[in-house]
């Protein structure tokens, strides 16, 4: 049996690498070929017909006309498009529809998508309710990126970790983007 291909599009390495590596490990165990790169590389390879159809996994589905054309090209060439929005939808005291759905998910792009993975029940329930005709495209999976944060996935114990967290500490957020 021929192995199927998964192409993972990564935009921000610092944010997405670890979660995508976890996704890669799981996919490799299930006998997929996995390729990770940025969208411009995949666009070039697609244009030159240097990659075979498979699953394209991206970090968002709605991101301007260039991404829409790329998705259309993939869709026409029989690629399956899947996505998880890396910027999730939990926004304190903001209207979810106005600030997340309108900017991050569109019916036009969702029609080209085979699966949209949700971080949690909040996203999952609202998106299924909002996009009733496409509700079966939404999957409650969690985020590979946030799975890395959990203690149960402890690839290698840091010897100093216990000492560090015994003392009080201050966490300073250095990324003040709106929904990240």
Where are the regions that the model predicts?
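Phosphate-coordination loops involved in phosphoryl transfer and adenosine-cofactor binding
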Residues: 3, 167
